[in-house]
């Protein structure tokens, strides 16, 4: 059967079509719209403009799915709508105008779906999974392919960019402010205090962008998905706006992460703090995550 999945995130709204046959599925195509819903949250309230952007994008996806007679559609939303004070009202407004039922998944559920999707085809049985989203960061530790701890932190690449960064790229002072909040938030996650030297499986746009920049800057193959954590601070330093960024670095940034120019450095700051907090030396990027985990758990698992 053909199954449409719509993931309404804080930074992007993604739609993918999967062919599901028995216990296996294949992604046939995907689309992405960089909407930046988290930037429409003012004083904790999702603004009408954000609702309008979500409606426009979902109606576009709905027309596409209808064209190919894909009637099975599941939509879910994460931090931007989940954490808004008017979450229920905003979701109901979007549902009413689009005819698409939206499931608001909790931070705990998001972390679980991340884990299921990202680790299904990986060889390492134990480690640390991190998903730095636009409005939240999910962390899961696992051993023998079983979840040990999981949490969702209220920090993300777009929320940091909106809160701290005045222009497109941050200044050194803005980087320090983001670093301080990331450290304080992560330090409060006491369940993880004893974990160290765990290899990180990273999912989401921040880690995808980190690998692209790492490969470009360190002359590695474009297909490489492994990143030494010691390189992250060096990568950040190349793109701080008041440290004399060169034209060569501007070209590298635009070539590697054209759709994440304003969020990649805030996301990398969170990644840097996490990797040092857990004394991790390596990150492996996985392009499977919450959508694939949702299929395994909510569609194939039922």
List PLM regions with ranges.
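Gly/Thr-rich phosphate-binding beta-strand-loop-beta motif of the actin/hexokinase/Hsp70
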Residues: 1-25, 118, 124-153, 205, ...
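Short acidic/polar active-site loop segments enriched in Thr and Asp
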Residues: 11, 71, 281
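N-terminal capping/interface segment
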Residues: 13, 66-67
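N-terminal glycine-rich anion-binding loops that anchor highly charged ligand groups
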Residues: 24-32, 67-68
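Helical "lid/coupling" subdomains associated with nucleotide-phosphate turnover
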Residues: 40-64, 78-90, 96-120, 124-126, ...
């Amino acid at each position: 059967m053909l199954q449409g999945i719509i993931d309404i995130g804080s930074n992007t709204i993604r739609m993918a079509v999967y062919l599901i046959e028995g216990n296996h599925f294949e992604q046939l195509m995907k689309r992405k719209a960089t909407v930046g819903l988290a930037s429409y949250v003012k004083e904790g309230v999702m603004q009408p403009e954000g609702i309008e952007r979500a409606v426009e994008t979902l109606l576009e996806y709905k027309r596409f799915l209808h064209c190919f007679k894909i009637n099975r559609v599941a939509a879910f939303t994460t931090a931007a709508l989940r954490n808004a004070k008017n979450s229920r009202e905003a979701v109901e407004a979007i549902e009413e105008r689009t005819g698409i039922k939206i499931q608001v998944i909790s931070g705990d559920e998001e972390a679980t779906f991340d884990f299921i999707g990202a680790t299904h085809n990986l060889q390492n049985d134990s480690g640390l999974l991190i998903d730095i989203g636009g409005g939240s960061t999910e962390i899961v530790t696992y051993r023998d392919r079983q979840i040990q701890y999981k949490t969702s932190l209220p920090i993300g690449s777009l929320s940091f960019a909106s809160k701290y960064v005045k222009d497109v790229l941050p200044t050194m002072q803005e980087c320090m402010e983001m670093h301080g909040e990331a450290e304080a938030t992560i330090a409060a996650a006491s369940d993880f205090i004893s974990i160290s030297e765990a290899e990180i499986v990273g999912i989401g746009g921040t880690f995808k962008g980190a690998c692209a920049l790492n490969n470009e800057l360190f002359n590695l193959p474009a297909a490489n998905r492994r990143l030494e954590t010691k390189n992250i601070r060096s990568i950040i330093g190349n793109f701080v706006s008041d440290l004399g960024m060169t034209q060569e670095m501007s070209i590298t940034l635009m070539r590697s992460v054209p759709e994440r120019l304003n969020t990649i450095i805030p996301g990398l700051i969170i990644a840097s703090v996490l990797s040092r907090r857990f004394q991790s030396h390596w990150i492996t990027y996985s392009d499977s995550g919450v959508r694939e985990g949702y299929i395994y758990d909510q569609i194939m698992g039922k």
